[in-house]
Amino acid sequence: MNPIVPAVERPIEDVQAKADERQIAINKVGIKDIRHPVRVSDRNGGEQHTVANFNMYVDLPHHFKGTHMSRFVEILNQHEHEITVRSFREMLREMNHRLQAESGHIEMVFPYFVTKQAPVSKVQSLMDYQVTFIGEIKGDKPQITVKVVVPVTSLCPCSKQISDYGAHNQRSHVTVAVRIEGFIWLEDIIDLVEEEASCEIYGLLKRPDEKYVTERAYDNPKFVEDMVRDVAARLNQDDRVSAYRVESENFESIHNHSAYAMIEREK
């Protein structure tokens, strides 16, 4: 009987590491819309367990055929621990190092919850806010932008002025994107916006609370232009913010369109 000769394993070819002859570099290549559990620290000293959607890209030099897609997922799996601005910077650096890239980009979108107390009854409920961390790195210099969508109430000053009673009001989305130096709490951004709105909104209100928020908005009317200017004025005074973009969209209750305003500034 002839002895069994073990098969010789052939090396697996690394196709993406081959040279590319077209001599065209790629600005961004990577993975898009991958969901991953994360833990986000909050201002009260706790943390929230949530699920984020990630986009992760790097540049690719003209002489490489492809990037190493699996390494993006490996990096995510290594960062299941608490996500902060600091750890987000570390993730950017690690991604560039692992993929031998000159520049990198990570976006992380997730719901963030804040426990709010109704203004009169003091009943508590959760409010959700859409948060995005955007990281850009070139060389070893990461830049972090934090974006928060804050729903508020807006009431029209013109409608109040010309009407014998009442004024049209609506829910608005104020989107604040700040490029930060150091650290900023998400709640700091949320509080700033809600303080400048006609009135903030709540997950749960009793009748005395409804009366309060209705009258509060009526006493504090604001155009969409007022909203972005008032938020921008606050951001101008915040040394943690090196650049910002403020957008406000009013979902008009008397029209089938929205009112919109935006201010963008490098400080």
Curated annotation (Swiss-Prot):
<feature type="site" description="May be catalytically important">
    <location>
        <position position="156"/>
    </location>
</feature>
<dbReference type="Pfam" id="PF02649">
    <property type="entry name" value="GCHY-1"/>
</dbReference>
<keyword id="KW-0378">Hydrolase</keyword>
<dbReference type="InterPro" id="IPR003801">
    <property type="entry name" value="GTP_cyclohydrolase_FolE2/MptA"/>
</dbReference>
<comment type="function">
    <text>Converts GTP to 7,8-dihydroneopterin triphosphate.</text>
</comment>
<dbReference type="GO" id="GO:0003934">
    <property type="term" value="F:GTP cyclohydrolase I activity"/>
</dbReference>
<comment type="pathway">
    <text>Cofactor biosynthesis; 7,8-dihydroneopterin triphosphate biosynthesis; 7,8-dihydroneopterin triphosphate from GTP: step 1/1.</text>
</comment>
<comment type="similarity">
    <text>Belongs to the GTP cyclohydrolase IV family.</text>
</comment>
<dbReference type="InterPro" id="IPR022838">
    <property type="entry name" value="GTP_cyclohydrolase_FolE2"/>
</dbReference>
<dbReference type="GO" id="GO:0046654">
    <property type="term" value="P:tetrahydrofolate biosynthetic process"/>
</dbReference>
<protein>
    <recommendedName>
        <fullName>GTP cyclohydrolase FolE2</fullName>
        <ecNumber>3.5.4.16</ecNumber>
    </recommendedName>
</protein>
